[in-house]
């Protein structure tokens, strides 16, 4: 410091630097008004009085997140206090009856009032009455909400939980988290029977077997994977965490999930629930199988022959066509029939080879149209032929050659010679 002469017989002192304190509570300086306000707050904390007005009307608000249950009865809220002795808290005892709890179902909040923080604030220095204050303990039990699929690092308290004075938050509580067991989902799927050539949509057959609302699946991704008998992935349905629905992705994007197997095929659908955060619990999966049974159609071809003199051993040739494609060729005798199996649905035409059986006239121009479908899987085609008699010259036919000479003499049986007509 420096001394300076203020007047006759008077001396004053001027501060040239602050004292370098080694601990708190003794010497504080301020450079501006904000620092000055902080000084008085610090002094208040150290001389043993509350620096914020938190009387018995103060509200302690604990808002439970929607992933856990809220107590239905305020009587389930356990209220107690523990007295501080300057170094540790004593055993909890029941709180004064003036401290009460209430539940607000609309906001899922547990509200506690009646504890006077001004009177009971905790300090390391004894107060004027020799006490060190006490803390308020609020306890209640919660359980996982029904339908919640779990996950890691799930918050138990809403971020608006804290201490409120006159409706204003004074201090927010820390937000603790809890790892919650990840629940599995067992999918289901319908079996289906189709006919060869028909199709089935896998999206219509697979059932999620769960409802997602964005809250019950807030911390897990859910994926349904459909595979064929060879283990190849046909499609996946994914519901991202926090979403109420998902999207299908197919290995054959143009198919839209439609398949047309040529033989009976069994598929597997697996539902995997995966936590989005690291922690105690990992992904869980459940699967189910379903079968698309493929039946085939049949076509019966019959031959009838009319007309006297028909050859009982005459054969008739038929070509079975599907569009421009030859399906098969069959040969029948009169009065016989045959059944072609393993056919797909569609339009067929049975065409008789009339050149083969040229001496027989076929009705309907030798054609018969048949449509096979899931409602009429077994079709029939009949063609009737009529025998037409033809008289033909053969090597055994006798011919009489009759001619007359110029002299009008009948020369039947004689070889003509010179001088004849």
Walk through the language-model features, giving the residues of each.
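Venus flytrap/periplasmic-binding-protein-like
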Residues: 1
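Solvent-exposed loop/turn and edge beta-strand elements of beta-rich ligand-binding domains
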Residues: 4-10, 14, 18-421
């Amino acid at each position: 410091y420096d001394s300076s002469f203020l007047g006759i017989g008077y001396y004053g002192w001027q501060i040239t630097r602050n004292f370098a304190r080694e601990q708190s509570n003794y010497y504080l300086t301020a450079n501006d008004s904000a620092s000055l306000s902080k000084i008085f707050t610090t002094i208040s904390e150290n001389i043993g009085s509350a620096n914020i007005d938190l009387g018995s009307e103060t509200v302690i608000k604990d808002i439970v997140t929607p992933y856990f249950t809220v107590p239905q009865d305020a009587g389930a809220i356990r209220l107690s206090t523990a007295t501080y002795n300057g170094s540790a808290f004593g055993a909890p005892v029941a709180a004064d009856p003036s401290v009460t709890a209430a539940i607000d179902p609309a906001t899922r909040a547990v509200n506690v009032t009646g504890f006077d923080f001004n009177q009971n604030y905790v300090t390391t220095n004894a107060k004027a009455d020799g006490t060190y204050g006490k803390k308020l303990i609020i306890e209640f039990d919660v359980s996982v909400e029904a339908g919640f699929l779990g996950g890691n690092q799930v918050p138990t308290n809403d971020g608006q939980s804290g201490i409120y004075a006159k409706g204003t938050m004074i201090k927010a509580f820390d937000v603790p988290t809890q790892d919650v067991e990840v629940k599995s989902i067992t999918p289901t799927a319908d079996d289906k029977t189709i006919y060869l050539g028909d199709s089935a949509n896998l999206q219509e057959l697979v059932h999620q077997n769960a409802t997602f609302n964005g809250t019950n699946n807030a911390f897990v991704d859910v994926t349904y994977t459909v595979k064929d008998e060879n283990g190849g992935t046909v499609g996946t349905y994914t519901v991202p965490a926090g979403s109420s629905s998902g999207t299908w992705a197919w290995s054959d994007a143009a198919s839209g999930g439609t398949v047309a197997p040529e033989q009976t095929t069994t598929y597997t659908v697996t539902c995997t629930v995966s936590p989005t955060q690291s922690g105690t619990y990992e992904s869980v999966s459940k699967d189910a199988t379903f079968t698309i049974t493929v039946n085939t159609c049949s076509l019966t071809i019959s031959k009838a022959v009319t007309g006297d003199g028909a050859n009982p051993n005459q054969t008739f040739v038929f070509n079975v066509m599907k569009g421009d494609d030859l399906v098969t060729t069959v040969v029948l005798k009169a009065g016989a029939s045959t059944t072609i199996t393993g056919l797909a649905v569609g339009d067929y035409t049975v065409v008789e080879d009339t050149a083969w059986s040229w001496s027989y006239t076929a009705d309907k121009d030798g054609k018969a149209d048949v449509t096979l479908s899931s409602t009429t899987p077994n079709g029939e085609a009949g063609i009737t032929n009529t025998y037409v008699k033809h008289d033909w010259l053969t090597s055994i036919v006798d011919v009489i050659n009759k001619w007359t000479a110029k002299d009008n003499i009948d020369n039947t049986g004689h070889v003509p010679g010179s001088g004849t007509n």
